[in-house]
A protein has these predicted regions:
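Bacterial N-terminal signal peptides that target proteins for export
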Residues: 1-12
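Bacterial N-terminal signal peptides
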Residues: 10-21
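Boundary at the C-terminal end of the N-terminal hydrophobic targeting segment
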Residues: 25-31
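Primary mode marks residue(s) on the alpha4-beta5-alpha5 output face of response regulator receiver
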Residues: 31-246
Length: 246
């Protein structure tokens, strides 16, 4: 049993395919990842961590404009899960996602993945709980199949709540690393719902700026809208995300 491809990862590929920066073959690889991968097992935990605490805080905050992220709670990854590094004042929470929640199956154990995100209060009380739980499981060495079963069971037992109204996320960072297949994503916003019809947003229709993905296992619907600026205020153009290197 293979773990489902992360909805965020699918969206990452969809964004770049729509913008013409990823070849069709790469998108197909996301849909059916090859079992031949350099990330067939968990790397040493230290490779998933960032030794520079200040650098991880700054990377997490880069997900949203400074006017939002400066007063947000910031979480950094410890050996057993996310830990609060900075207390927030405005209800937002920022963190740097790792491979277990941010990439495709073939890169489930890729220790290089770093995906900055800032969620609002509604998402912090719903969507973020799933991310933190999956991160704990990943650090504990759960296999993709085990994690897939665990998240479904936790939702069925109502240990993880449905999405709160208004739950959303800023992913506007120039920094980070989305994985070897699609290293850099466009600047975008995400909106989270529980079991919502994609058609209600006109998602994925010709000419629509809205990308949508529904996950029946997690009863989660995610909508994405690309925005025209990075979090630092500079203009987003097709290409810089793909050309930006670390």
């Amino acid at each position: 049993m293979s773990r489902k491809i992360s909805a965020i990862a699918i969206i990452g590929f969809a964004l770049l395919v729509v913008l013409g920066t990823v070849h069709q073959a790469m998108a197909q690889a996301a849909a059916a990842p090859s079992p031949a991968t350099p990330y067939s097992k968990m790397a040493p935990i230290d490779q998933y961590l960032m030794a520079d605490r200040a650098a991880e805080i700054a990377l997490a905050r880069s997900a949203a404009p400074e006017s939002i992220s400066r007063d947000a709670e910031v979480m950094i990854l410890g050996r057993h899960g996310f830990e609060t590094a900075v207390k927030g004042k405005n209800g937002f929470a920022c963190a740097v996602g790792r491979s277990w929640t941010s990439t495709v199956d073939a890169e489930f154990w890729n220790p290089k993945v770093r995906v900055p995100a800032c969620v609002n209060a509604a998402a912090a009380r719903s969507y973020l709980l799933r991310v933190t739980k999956e991160t704990e499981w990943g650090l504990a060495g759960r296999t993709p199949a085990q994690m897939n079963a665990a998240i479904a069971a936790a939702i069925a037992r109502k240990e993880l709540p449905p999405m709160e109204p208004g739950a959303m996320c800023y992913m506007m960072s120039k920094e980070g690393y989305g994985g070897d297949s699609v290293p850099h994503w466009p600047s975008h916003l995400m909106f989270f719902y529980s079991d919502t019809d994609l058609a209600s947003w006109g998602a994925n229709l010709p000419g629509s700026p809205v990308i949508g993905v529904s996950d029946s296992v997690e009863h989660l619907t995610q909508f994405v809208v690309v925005v025209q600026r990075w979090s630092d205020g500079t203009e987003y153009r097709e290409g810089p995300a793909a050309e930006h290197h670390h």
